[in-house]
Amino acid sequence: MSIPFEVISATLALSIGSFMNVLDSTIVNVSLTHIAGDFAVAPTQGTWVITSYAVSEAIFLPLIGWLTKRFGIVRQYTLATLFFTGASVLCGISFSFGFLLFARVLQGVVGASMIPLSQTLMLSFYPKEKKAMALGIWSMTIVLAPVLGPVIGGWITDSFSWRWCFYINVPFGILSTYIVHSIFRKKGYKDKIEKVPVDKWGLIFLAIGISALQIMLDKGNDLDWFQSPFIISLALIAFIFLTILVIWEWYHPTPVVNVKLFLNKNFSIGALSITIASIAFFASVVVIPLWLQNYMGYTALDSGIATSTLGLSILFTAPILGSILNNLDARKVVVFGFVLFSITAILTGNYPPDITVSYIAGSRFLTGIGLGIFFIPLNTITLSDIPPEELTGASGLYNFTRNIGNSFGTPLAINYWNNRISIHHQDIVSAINVGNPNFQSYINHFSSPLHMKLEMINELITQQSALMGVNDIIIGSGIMILLLIPLIFLARRPIVK
């Protein structure tokens, strides 16, 4: 059966929108030093460019179901994409660091609904036997974007300016908005709008709780976690207000966040699984480029290219899996993906000191195959038992849990990596026998002063410790994914509707 041109056009437009949105969460990661330098702020302050976007998006993701009831799905998506494009322009023309942060907050607020709504709209174009394929295409853009973000950002920053990391959104945002609006208007689509009352207290509890949680996650590593009174305060605020939010929304007749979705067995299993899987996946995505840049002498662009093969394998895996998923038990496919991801991580998590670019690229490619296999059917399992009228809200909440996993994964991975570096460094130093003839021969081989020889040896030990720490991260991520397998078997088998 051939696919109509308007379906292909809508798929392309919606994929561009979701890709552009997710891309902006990582594209500036490699440009922070340039941004901080341009505005004469400390490098540590530069990270607020990431935090401000993440916090505002995290607050509004759970609100998607409520927002679409008030404004309609198509109108909400097109306005969100258009405003996101405008906010990108504001980021690019920023004349001060404060204005840039304001523009990034605006990006997160208006763009939060783009991801779940692009999924909902894309699925609406396909018949039931093709929905899995549509989901495969959509999932591909979501997983590819954070992997390719540093590569694209590094190239743009090196070749042009960090400001073009934002300007690049303009033509794609306008194109996505125009195509989606035109196609749905041509189809005579009418948005269903309900005058849902505003749950003001729910909004307040959500904003305070999520803001505190996201800032705690983003700044915890920099402030030594719970050694900092600021982080402790944020943790308490997040716990108190999110607990109040759950209780309040549970009994509210028109909640901004439908927390009762977690009573759905498949949704709860899927949300928990994607949170943990995102932590495991993002750990290596963050740490490997840092290791390549800080210890192996790679540039940001080179490290991004070396690891981008993970996205390349997803590019091939997702559409193929999507086309055959309806004929398979999604639970078994997820488990197969988990096993493949874990085996690949455990077997390749033994990087040698003389590692080559091809070895890194090959190992990330194999890992990406497992990731691509489990990501799509896990989405299918999660949303399989959700009523149509709650699907958009459930998609927003599911994507929120994925974002939380990413947010947890980054600081946890960096903190764990630093701890493993310290442990391995101590172990290697304690194992050195200064009286060993081989050690003495190595020392005497150089004519430098003794203190320079010791500094050089310490640098070699640190480099080896960092490598061993990376291997620990990769193997640990594989083990985390394996532990999710029993949870998947508790889910009901999704039925194609």
Label each residue range with its predicted role.
Residues F5-K69, V74-A80, S88, G98-L100, ...:
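Transmembrane core module of solute transporters
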Residues F19, T51-V55, L82, G136-M140, ...:
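Transmembrane alpha-helical cores of Major Facilitator Superfamily
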Residues Q45, K130-I137, E390-L397, G469:
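Cytoplasmic loop-to-transmembrane helix junctions
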Residues L61-G202:
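Helix-loop-helix hairpins in multi-pass membrane proteins, especially solute transporters
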Residues V89-I93, T177-S182, T243-I247, I346-N350, ...:
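Membrane-embedded alpha-helical segments of multi-pass transporters/permeases
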Residues V147-L148, I360-F439:
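Small-residue-rich alpha-helical segments with characteristic i,i+4
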Residues P171-Y189, A207-K219, I237-Y251, I485-R492:
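C-terminal membrane-cytosol helix-exit motif in multi-pass small-molecule transporters
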Residues N403-L490:
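Hydrophobic transmembrane architecture of multi-pass small-molecule transporters
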